[in-house]
Structure formats: structure tokens, C-alpha cells
Amino acid sequence: FHNALDDDIEMSDEELFHQSSAFIETLQLVYSWNPELFELSRAGSLSQIWSMYYQRILGANSVLDYLEDVSGTVEEKASVRAQAYTLRAFYYFNLVNLFGGPYNHDKSAAGVPLKLTSDLTDGFDTRATVSEVYDRILKDLDEAEKNFAVLSEKQQKSMGYRINLPAMQLLRARVCLHMENMEGAAKYARKVIDDWGYELYDMSGKVDTLYVNYMTLDNPETIWMYGSPDDVTSMLALSATMND
């Protein structure tokens, strides 16, 4: 999701007029830490987020269930398996943070249902605990790391819209950070910084340009790209609805 609640924001000098002052007022909620950030009466998108992630988890589960039944080299299957495990961990990480509590607040609190196969079973009648969801995330990332190790360095850093090893390491660092495992967070963040040659995107001189498009593969910070512009803005549209 879009990182709105931080101080990494700079406004251009260009005057911007919008046809609706209400639109501007609603967006102020996102950038002012307003307690009414979410107006649940209009939060139909929350159910869409839930179903969207579980649809993608179904895709990852299907890959893992049937991968051995298809042809392919050891390296090709390892690549696909590594991507599926990383993506499933990514989806569950987002789900448990959206619909569960903070990891170190109450590990026994309700998290989200863990669906680990593509079988057509209910599986949604019980929510796993926050601790159980994080345990599964770490297990999936362990499996992903093992499978990435089979690949060449070039294959590990495949660019474009396929998950890669540095993206998995970045996700692992973020998971560790949410668990307040600072040693693990630093370990995997350092791997991303030291091992892959990514550079910071130079935005100096762009402050006068409205709507700088930094979400491109040409951005030297880009590790992995996915989704569409709608995915970036959908949570803003949901979050910025203002109460009457």
C-alpha cells in the first residue's frame, strides 16, 4: 500500500486546483493522522481486499499443489516454487496486518484463516492466531530461500514483474521488523543493500514536476513491480472518505 503516513513528502510550487474542494478535504485525513481515517460505513473495499488476497493465495496454493505434475527443469521448478512461497507469505503478511492485531501486542489474538491448499474445503470458519500466521509466513520464506538458492545469481535477481530473491529478503526484513526482531530485520535488509547494487532514486530537480512517475522499472530503487496504478490508489480512495 502507498506509504502516506510518513514525512517523506515534498510539495511543488505549482498551484493545483481541483474541481471539488471536498476531494482535497478528504485527502487531508490521510496526511494528518486523523482518527477518522477509515469510515467503515463506506468500506466496501475492505471485503474486496480480503477476497482479492485469498484469490491470490489460491493461485499460490495451486502452484505448490500441482508443480510436480508438470514438466520442467529443476531450476525452472525451483524458481516457480520460490515465487509461490514468497507471494503467499506476502499476501498473508498484508492480511494479518490489515485484519489482525500487532504481533507483540497479543500473539494469541485472532489473525486470519490459514488456507494452505487449493482443495475446495471451507477452511474459513476459524481464524489462526497472529502468532500462527507469522509462523507460517516465516516457514514460507524459509522454503522460498531454499529454492532461490538453487538458481544462478542472474536468475535470483530477475527483474520485471516476477518476485525475486532481493524482494524476498526485503519482505523478510519487514516481517522481522513487525515482530520486533531487530537483528533479523537488519540481517536481511543488509543483504538487499549490500548484495544487489540497488541505488537511491535521485529526485533532486523534480520538485517542480507534478506527479513524478517513479513507479517504473527504470527507477534504480525498483526491486519488484506488481499490480497497477489502481492498486496504489485504492487504499487512499478508501481511507480518505470524510465523515459528514
Descriptions of predicted regions:
Residues 1-13:
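Acidic, glycine-rich segments characteristic of secretory precursors and extracytoplasmic regions
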Residues 27-99, 128, 146-149:
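Conserved, well-structured interaction surfaces
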Residues 73-80, 133, 157-160, 164:
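Structural signature of alpha-solenoid helical repeat junctions
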Residues 180, 186-244:
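Hydrophobic-face positions in mid-chain alpha helices that act as interaction patches
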